[in-house]
């Protein structure tokens, strides 16, 4: 596995005004990559997109950290431009989503990042009466984004989000996969966030199974939105499933809030997940549990 951290959870002052702190911290704890949020709307502390790209390109080279993904924020609660936020279910706000995502795709291309996150934010409640129209807007919008991303050698990862934050529409791996298949695009995959999955999925294994073969990226935070191990997600089962399906993408850790503090959350997260990965690989060997293979 490759391990990354979602930088925005360190706070905006660090992420935009003193980002070298993030790079130094992640190298000290053995991370492979950093996940960034572009400076847009209420995010950025006045840093321009040009400054953001130049600074992170320099730091990524200096610290030999990959940039695992660029993650725009979606949904009314998190979108940088709330309340006039982007969605994937209504034409005008979907056009905004397309413009914003293309801008982020350009940044990802400059920074050498393979992925940009997209999510389903809804414009109004979805019901049996309007679901077909919403799906049509989402599919058309995703196709437009994917066509642009393909020209930049960037892929999009579609994050499955819980219904309390994004509304009842496309909340499960199975429904994300259905929507992706409707687009017909090869550069659109799935991003699991284990906090959201805890609301929507039957269990960890079935979530990973349903996402195949489109599981390209993941966010690791626990059921209480804290660092892995601080809640009750069965991350050993998660790791066994990932090993079984030969997952080779990033495991991006996040914690919101940074409990009990940044250093402990960052250190405990990667230490615990690496232990879970090690145990998973041991449990799947033919010698387990007797010490010899039959």
Predicted regions located by residue number:
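Structural detector of well-ordered beta-strand residues that form the stable sheet scaffold
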Residues: 4, 68, 116-117, 157, ...
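Conserved active-site loop/cleft motifs that coordinate metal ions or position small ligands
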Residues: 249-256
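Active-site groove signature of glycoside hydrolases
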Residues: 108-128, 157-162
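A short small-residue
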Residues: 78-85, 117-126, 252
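Acidic/histidine-rich catalytic cores of soluble enzymes
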Residues: 33-34, 39-40, 70, 133-240, ...
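A structural motif
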Residues: 31, 113, 215, 247-248
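N-terminal pre-domain/capping segments
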Residues: 1-113, 132-133, 143, 150, ...
């Amino acid at each position: 596995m490759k391990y990354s951290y979602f930088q925005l959870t360190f706070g905006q002052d660090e992420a935009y005004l003193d980002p070298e702190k993030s790079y130094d911290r992640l190298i000290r704890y053995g991370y492979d990559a950093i996940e960034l949020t572009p400076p847009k709307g209420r995010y950025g502390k006045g840093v321009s997109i040009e400054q953001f790209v130049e600074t992170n390109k320099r730091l990524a080279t200096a610290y030999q950290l990959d940039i695992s993904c660029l993650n725009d924020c979606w949904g009314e609660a998190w979108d940088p431009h709330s309340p006039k936020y982007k969605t994937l279910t209504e034409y005008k706000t979907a056009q905004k989503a397309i413009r914003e995502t293309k801008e982020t795709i350009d940044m990802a291309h400059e920074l050498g990042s393979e992925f940009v996150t997209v999510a389903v934010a809804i414009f109004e409640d979805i019901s049996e009466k309007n679901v077909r129209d919403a799906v049509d807007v989402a599919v058309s919008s995703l196709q437009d984004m994917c066509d642009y991303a393909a020209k930049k050698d960037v892929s999009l990862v579609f994050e499955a989000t819980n219904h309390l934050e994004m509304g009842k529409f496309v909340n499960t791996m199975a429904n994300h996969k259905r929507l992706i298949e409707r687009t017909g695009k090869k550069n659109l995959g799935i991003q699991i966030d284990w906090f959201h999955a805890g609301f929507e999925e039957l269990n960890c294994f079935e979530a990973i199974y349903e996402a195949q073969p489109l599981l390209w990226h993941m966010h690791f935070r626990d059921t209480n939105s804290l660092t892995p191990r601080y809640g009750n997600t069965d991350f050993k089962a998660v790791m066994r499933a990932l090993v079984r399906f030969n997952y080779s993408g990033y495991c991006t850790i996040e914690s919101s809030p940074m409990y009990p503090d940044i250093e402990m959350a960052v250190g405990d997260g990667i230490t615990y997940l690496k232990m879970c990965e090690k145990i998973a690989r041991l449990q799947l060997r033919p010698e387990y549990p007797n010490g010899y293979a039959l």
